[in-house]
UniProtKB/Swiss-Prot annotation:
This is Enolase 1. Residues 34-56 are annotated as: Disordered. It is found in: Cytoplasm; Secreted; Cell surface. The active site is at 205 (proton donor), 342 (proton acceptor). Gene3D superfamilies: Enolase-like C-terminal domain, Enolase-like, N-terminal domain. Belongs to the enolase family. InterPro entries: Enolase, Enolase-like_C_sf, Enolase-like_N, Enolase_C, Enolase_CS, Enolase_N. GO terms for molecular function: magnesium ion binding; phosphopyruvate hydratase activity. PROSITE patterns: ENOLASE.
Length: 433
């Protein structure tokens, strides 16, 4: 095997025009890997620290030169000489070098860039695809996509509190067909919005951000788009998902929809929030709800799980922040039944894989996810297949930063050929159907 001989980081821009890191790792045998780091807009308060410069005269304070310097001057010195295929040793060494619980010293963005680049260099060293290197020859499940075709909340200027309205093509026979279904529904939706005189500009994740009359108007319009594209809503066709991102409009025990929806918005207690979500589930073909309760509302999460946990996938994003400490508590207290996996919430591939493994062992599903600030890096596609996670959330059917992930999955499906599996509805193994 081959040792790491050089590590180099630079500042590049993400899909929102904000700085992020790109890291390159080189080995003595000439292998090479590059990793780029995403960034979130709505972030959980317990996430690992994304190190920013804070210099308002440069990139409005969002520069990442400190993190770049930490890679080039501190991490590189510690990691050069490591065997490139010893991912756990590399990641553990960086965690120890940082020495904080939340990676606040070196920055999770600095550490993650090296973690991804090292894995890619190792795959290059061995001459195998990244998903194969990370998951071995059992990596074969193409994920069911959750496609965010309507953006609300902090991801757009649309007056809707829920951050994402997603379509989930559970009835498609292959990933390739699932992607086609999604694209056709996306374009059907655009025609419907235009016919209503609504805005068809897209938000951060490639979905539309029209001024709907509320949540139900958004869902009804998506259902019309599904039908207009020639598909049907339901378990043998296309289902609906929400990312409520409730922490963005929760304050002092109140779920305050007026923050995004104005005077017409609701103000709900935790129990009323559960009632509202249950009402939506009874009315529409909803299969997944992410962050339906605030990240610190553990009692609310337990009530929600008791009421809906056998019918709907209840995903903890801000709630768990890809951290096994919070996930373990959620499993123990029966709060949610799924975890969203975001590599930059925790900061290394090793810890990411540990969270996925813990979830699966508990019967929780794990959904590999992008961030709203993305790059052309498609590592999450390989992670989804490597872990046989079965689900991915990587945006709408527009914007190259989103399509890069879908296109990589098409390549992987082609490479796997007859071995490839698309689970569709069966990817939601946490539901008692």
């Amino acid at each position: 095997m081959s040792i790491i001989t050089d590590i180099y980081a630079r500042e590049v821009l993400d899909s929102r025009g904000n700085p992020t890191l790109e890291v390159e790792v080189y080995t003595e045998d000439g292998a090479f890997g590059r990793g780029m780091v995403p960034s979130g807009a709505s972030t959980g308060e317990h996430e690992a620290v994304e190190l920013r410069d804070g210099d308002k005269s440069r990139y409005n304070g969002l520069g990442t030169q400190k993190a770049v310097d930490n890679v080039n001057n501190i991490i590189a010195e510690a990691i050069i000489g490591y065997e490139v295929t010893d991912q756990q040793a590399i990641d553990r060494a960086m965690i120890a070098l940082d020495g904080t619980e939340n990676k606040g010293k070196l920055g999770a963005n600095a550490i993650l860039g090296v973690s991804i680049a090292a894995a890619r260099a190792a795959a290059d060293e061995l001459g195998v695809p990244l998903y194969n290197y990370l998951g071995g020859f059992n990596a074969k499940v193409l994920p069911t996509p959750m496609m965010n075709i309507i953006n609300g909340g902090s991801h757009s200027d649309a007056p809707i509190a829920f951050q994402e309205f997603m379509i989930v093509p559970v009835g498609a026979p292959t990933f390739k067909e699932a992607l086609r279904w999604g694209a056709e529904i996306f374009h059907a939706l655009k025609k419907i919005l235009k016919a209503r005189g609504l805005e068809t500009a897209v938000g951060d994740e490639g979905g539309f951000a029209p001024k709907f009359d509320g949540t139900e108007d958004g869902v009804e319009t998506i259902l019309k788009a599904i039908e207009a594209a020639g598909y049907k809503a339901g378990e043998d066709g296309v289902m609906i998902g929400f990312d409520c991102a409730s922490s963005e409009f929760y304050e002092n025990g109140v779920y305050d929809y007026t923050k995004f929806e104005g005077e017409g918005g609701k103000k709900l207690s935790a129990s009323e929030q559960v009632d509202y979500l249950e009402e939506l589930v009874s009315k529409y073909p909803i299969i997944t709800i992410e962050d339906g309760m605030d990240e610190n509302d553990w009692d609310g999460w337990k009530i929600l799980t008791e009421r809906l946990g056998k019918k709907v996938q209840l995903v903890g994003d801000d709630f768990f922040v890809t951290n096994t400490k919070y996930l373990e508590r959620g499993i123990r207290e029966n709060a949610s039944n799924a975890i969203l996996i975001k590599v930059n919430q925790i900061g290394t591939l090793t810890e990411t894989f540990e969270a996925i493994e813990m979830a699966k062992e508990a019967g929780f599903t794990a959904i590999v996810s992008h961030r709203s600030g993305e790059t052309e890096d498609s590592t999450i596609s390989d992670i989804a297949v490597a872990t046989n996670a079965g689900q991915i959330k990587t945006g709408s059917l527009s914007r190259t930063d989103r399509m890069a992930k879908y296109n990589q999955l098409l390549r992987i499906e082609d490479q796997l050929a007859e071995v490839a599996q698309y689970k569709g509805l069966k990817a939601f193994y946490n539901l008692k159907k």
